[in-house]
Amino acid sequence: MTEYLLLLISTVLVNNFVLVKFLGLCPFMGVSSKLESAIGMSMATTFVLTLASILSYLVNQYLLLPFDLSYLRTMSFILVIAVVVQFTEMVVQKTSAALHRALGIYLPLITTNCAVLGVALLNVNEKHDFIQSAIYGFGAAVGFSLVLILFSAMRERLAAADVPLPFKGGAIAMITAGLMSLAFMGFTGLVK
């Protein structure tokens, strides 16, 4: 049980996919201008990352490895992710049309979010079992969501702040992301 908790904490804080591994930067910068969109994207990404991580593990263990098809791993994981994203998009469209409109193009772009594929591939490389794969996927999603929501809240405050003209927009966003990354470096010694 302790091993699973350490894996979760490590994935969320110490080895954050956005700030440490630099995966998922496109939605991190693209959806973070409004807090409401960031929360919606976080929920959708959490669902997709967790489910895709579990399904990728199952596809790898019960389809690719037994038939010696490991060379198709990346392509099959992309297919699994695309199916999960389409399912998520249908659910979001049925449950919240406003959220579906707010997320716009970013919801289908979860398919190409490198963090989702990165989690699936790292699960295989780190030889996680089923429970570890689920926890790793969920932890990566929670870490992504945490950073996205915090960054979005900071960007909303920066939009209202008196920022010098050369730093407005993307420049101050990159500086803020760098400072967030430095703050998360404080968690480095937390899990060994």
Curated annotation (Swiss-Prot):
InterPro entries: Ion_transpt_RnfA/RsxA, NqrDE/RnfAE, NqrDE/RnfAE_oxidrdctase
Pfam families (alphabetical): Rnf-Nqr
This protein's UniProt keywords: Cell inner membrane, Cell membrane, Electron transport, Membrane, Translocase, Transmembrane, Transmembrane helix, Transport
Organism superkingdom: Bacteria
Magnesium is among the record's keywords: no
Subcellular location, record wording: Cell inner membrane
Residues annotated as signal peptide: none
Enzyme Commission code: 7.-.-.-
Chain's role: Part of a membrane-bound complex that couples electron transfer with translocation of ions across the membrane.
Assembly and interaction partners: The complex is composed of six subunits: RnfA, RnfB, RnfC, RnfD, RnfE and RnfG.
Name by which UniProt lists this protein: Ion-translocating oxidoreductase complex subunit A
Organism: Shewanella putrefaciens (strain CN-32 / ATCC BAA-453)
